[in-house]
Amino acid sequence: MKEVAVYQIPVLSPSGRRELAADLPAEINPHLLWEVVRWQLAKRRRGTASTKTRGEVAYSGRKIWPQKHTGRARHGDIGAPIFVGGGVVFGPKPRDYSYTLPKKVRKKGLAMAVADRAREGKLLLVEAFAGVNGKTKEFLAWAKEAGLDGSESVLLVTGNELVRRAARNLPWVVTLAPEGLNVYDIVRTERLVMDLDAWEVFQNRIGGEA
């Protein structure tokens, strides 16, 4: 990734707000983001859809009427695909939908997704979740101070289990551990909130791709 820009990212701390300079992609490639999201969803797909062929349906294989002299069309058994309840031709069978995507593309996609939130002013870094000890009401009080009122969906990334536990009951918050940060969850939510430890994990993951 050749084009890099310096983003000023707000950092929220108990003593107030400051800014952190970060090198992230200057240009966002929507198609690359789509490729990564498509790869993620394909990996999650169960692929259990299954239809029965004419050899698997629960019907006798007996010919339903003689070939000639009935005045009717020629048919074999009643399990043929032409009959209601018969087998399915070329229907889905259980399969694995996952495929490989180059690690470099995945790194670029993650860096671009975070950069897009930074460019929109929707990325917030947090030094400490003061007063949050596992209770939802504690997180709501902190969120109000941070300017998060539930009007926008939030992806909260932190290694602090107590903070994740406090926020997970809220319908407008998606919580992830730092290692679980991914493009799909970033693009499906409107704001990205990370603590500084999660930010460091992210920087190590993209490893120069910005």
Swiss-Prot record:
GO terms for molecular function: rRNA binding; structural constituent of ribosome. InterPro entries: Ribosomal_uL4, Ribosomal_uL4-like, Ribosomal_uL4_dom_sf. One of its GO terms (biological process) is translation. Changing E56A: Further decreases Ptase activity in E.coli hybrid ribosomes. Significantly decreases binding of a tRNA analog to the A or P site. The keyword Membrane does not apply. GO terms for cellular component: ribonucleoprotein complex; ribosome. The N-terminus is blocked. Signal peptide: none annotated. The keyword DNA-binding does not apply. Keywords: Ribonucleoprotein, Ribosomal protein, RNA-binding, rRNA-binding. Pfam families: Ribosomal_L4. Belongs to the universal ribosomal protein uL4 family. Part of the 50S ribosomal subunit. One of the primary rRNA binding proteins, this protein initially binds near the 5'-end of the 23S rRNA. It is important during the early stages of 50S assembly. It makes multiple contacts with different domains of the 23S rRNA in the assembled 50S subunit and ribosome. Forms part of the polypeptide exit tunnel. This is Large ribosomal subunit protein uL4. The lineage of its organism: Bacteria, Thermotogati, Deinococcota, Deinococci, Thermales. The gene is rplD.
